Curated annotation (Swiss-Prot):
Coiled coil: none annotated. Its EC number is 6.3.4.3. Belongs to the formate--tetrahydrofolate ligase family. Pfam families: FTHFS (PF01268). GO terms for biological process: tetrahydrofolate interconversion. It is an enzyme of class 6 (ligase). It catalyses: (6S)-5,6,7,8-tetrahydrofolate + formate + ATP = (6R)-10-formyltetrahydrofolate + ADP + phosphate. GO terms for molecular function: ATP binding; formate-tetrahydrofolate ligase activity. Keywords: ATP-binding, Ligase, Nucleotide-binding, One-carbon metabolism. ATP binds at residues 64-71. This is Formate--tetrahydrofolate ligase.
């Protein structure tokens, strides 16, 4: 089979205005970024049409280093739905350069289920990430300048919370010292970099309903505390307007196309392990304005992306998914059943059977939100008929729908069975109205503990002294009603990335809290999760090159 990039190049792309017209977007509302990419103004969203559209969330079992293929299934489902005559649009997150050149590779799907032009989407795309990076670091520069220019007046901050961001994986930038050298270089202080998808600006962009809301949220960003313990925000800095200007184009959803020429919105890109892991509300609602069926995905496993999709994105936007599809693979389940990474392609029914406990736990969790759930088995070449039959029988016993997805190899044709099951399930047994894990009025600790005990399976949650002090501060600031966003490893229900399966009765330790006052959520950091990833021993960058003007090795 051809590589992803070879398949992408073999597709004859439609002009983006043609794609826009095919779903009902007027040509004069399309802002071209080249021939095959466009931005669509957010004012085209029609809330009445949004209410009538069928929103489908695609999530997955707990992530493994073997990969699950959630984005490929999301795109494949959209292709399959279009194949059976439904007007379906997929709404995804934008890829980050860090993982693209690091361990994970690109994030535009795979095989014959991709969003295109793949190379541009995986690299600089429409510049949204660069705009977010610039906006975030502009705040850093303006804050440092404010402190420098006003130090003679006796002004200073007791604690500076605002760090810097960069869209690369670089462990050496996690903790730095700025302002070294002569006094004219600014005030010497500790700082550090997070990766751009972890930026509060990214979360704000993805949760904003329009430019005015974007500006309001930017104004509320908490930068630090004065010596008399008063919060110091972007509003105090007086630059919310300038920062909003840097994001005025980035807020508009991006329109591209799939390998079969159908519409796709790709916009926003927070990670689900260190942020809330969902594409922008605006892109989802734009897709729902023009599509009868809209497929969106949330990052990593259902314990991370799906939980945050429901408890944060849906809570803030009023979105109500009609169905949740959970992606499972034989290889991933075998890893959760104790099979080593180097042996997961070998037949192993016992390992697969043991790994099903991970799937079961996710399905129970999804049901707790009132969701109707179906399982999409993402087929790999090494999968056996016996393994697929075992999973089918297990889903039957669970009382959840099951379909095989082979869109990677066959495009939309390989997802027709899944598409038919999705339509049939939505028509006969759609999800109930969302039942959130916690209430707005619950305390921060109650929210964290409800997620940790009810969804992760923790028996106890412990807090560092730093965390307890910040929780007290949150209560004093009157923002305890914000939802919580737990940052933890994607490889386990626990905070230990080496504990696979369906672990229960463990201690979850919250070592720190980050107050995202602009994004209006509380980020609780569990375990040793890093908001700036490092590169692996053999980064993907070693395999990427350009030969005769053509990019190679991008996947």
């Amino acid at each position: 089979m051809k590589s992803d990039i070879e398949i992408a190049r073999s597709v004859e792309l439609k002009k983006i205005k043609q794609v826009a017209e095919s779903i009902g977007i007027p040509r004069d509302e399309v802002e071209n970024y080249g021939r095959y990419i466009a931005k669509i103004p957010e004012y085209l969203i029609d809330e009445e049409k949004v209410k009538k559209s069928n929103l489908i969330l695609v999530t997955a079992i707990t992530a493994t280093k073997a990969g699950i293929g959630k984005t490929t299934v999301s795109i494949g489902l959209a292709l399959g739905l279009n194949k059976i005559g439904k007007k379906a649009i997929v709404a995804l997150r934008e890829p980050s350069l860090g993982p693209c050149f690091g361990m994970k590779g690109g994030a535009a799907g795979g095989g014959y289920a991709q969003v295109l032009p793949m190379e541009k989407i995986n690299l600089h795309f429409t510049g949204d990430f660069h705009a977010i990076t610039s906006a975030h670091n502009m705040i850093s520069a303006l804050l440092d300048n404010y402190l420098y220019q006003n130090q003679s007046k006796g002004f200073g901050l007791k604690e500076i919370l605002w760090r810097r961001v960069l869209d690369v994986n670089d462990r050496s930038l996690r903790n730095i010292v700025v302002g070294l050298g002569p006094k004219t270089n600014g005030i010497t202080q500790e700082s550090g970099f997070d990766i751009t998808p972890a930026s509060e600006i990214m979360a704000i962009l993805c949760l904003s309903k329009d430019v005015d809301d974007l500006r309001r949220r930017i104004e509320n960003i908490l930068l630090g505390y004065t010596y008399d313990n008063k919060p110091f925000t972007v509003k105090d800095l007086g630059v919310a307007g300038a920062i909003t200007v840097l994001l005025k184009d980035a807020i508009h959803p991006n329109l591209v196309q799939t390998t079969e020429g159908t519409a796709a919105f790709v916009h926003g890109g927070p990670f689900a392990n260190i942020a809330h892991g969902c594409n922008s509300i605006l892109a989802t609602k734009m897709a729902m304005t023009f599509g009868d069926y809209v497929i969106t995905e949330a990052g990593f496993g259902a314990d991370l992306g799906a939980e945050k999709f429901y408890n944060i994105k849906c809570r803030k936007s009023g979105l109500q998914p009609r169905l949740t599809v959970i992606v499972a693979t034989a290889q991933g389940l075998k890893m959760h059943g104790g099979v080593s990474l180097d042996r997961i392609k070998e037949p192993n029914l016992e390992g697969l059977r043991e790994g099903l406990r991970n799937l079961d736990k996710h399905v129970r969790n999804l049901h707790s939100f009132g969701q109707t759930v179906i399982v999409a088995f993402n087929k790999f070449a090494s999968d056996t008929d016996e393994e697929m039959e075992l999973l089918r029988e297990h889903c039957e016993q669970l009382g959840v729908g099951y379909a095989i997805n082979n869109a990677f190899s066959e495009g939309g044709e390989g997802a027709v069975d899944l598409a038919n099951l999705v339509v049939e399930t939505i028509e006969n047994k759609p999800s109930e109205p969302l039942q959130f894990t916690y209430n707005d009025e619950d305390s921060v600790q109650q929210k964290i503990e409800k997620v940790a005990t009810n969804l992760y399976g923790a028996s106890v949650v412990t807090y560092s002294t730093l965390t307890r002090n910040k929780i007290k501060l949150i209560e004093e600031m009157g923002i305890g009603h914000y939802p919580v966003c737990i940052a933890k490893t994607q490889y386990s229900f626990s905070a230990d990335p080496k504990v696979y399966g369906a672990v229960d009765n463990f201690e979850l330790h919250i070592k720190d809290i980050v107050i995202n006052n602009g994004a209006e959520m509380i980020v609780a950091i569990a375990g040793e999760i890093m908001r700036m990833p490092g590169l692996p021993k053999e980064p993907q960058a070693l395999h990427i090159d350009i030969v005769d003007g053509n990019i190679e090795g991008l996947s």
